[in-house]
Amino acid sequence: MPDKLVVEVAYALPEKQYLQRVTLEEGATVEEAIRASGLLELRTDIDLAKNKVGIYSRPVKLTDTVQDGDRVEIYRPLIADPKALRRQRAEKSAGR
């Protein structure tokens, strides 16, 4: 009988956080964990072709395998370029 592992799948929005615990077969992938969590059905804004994923803030691929106790994180796309935002803030403070 294959070993089972327990993994958490997390997706955070400004107003709500989702954290689903799933039990998977040993050798399961990041994508399998996300699909088993049901988050793709709950949140239609998640697109695995566009959203980046990670395990404990470390970027990973959908095909990477998960380990027991991992927290798989689905990241939202950036809505603004961080460099452009810093530049705008610097220009604003210089103009004061």
Curated annotation (Swiss-Prot):
Pfam families: Ub-RnfH
Protein family membership: Belongs to the UPF0125 (RnfH) family.
NCBIfam families: PRK01777.1 (NF002490)
Annotated protein name in UniProt: UPF0125 protein YfjF
Biological source species: Salmonella typhimurium (strain LT2 / SGSC1412 / ATCC 700720)
Name of the encoding gene: yfjF
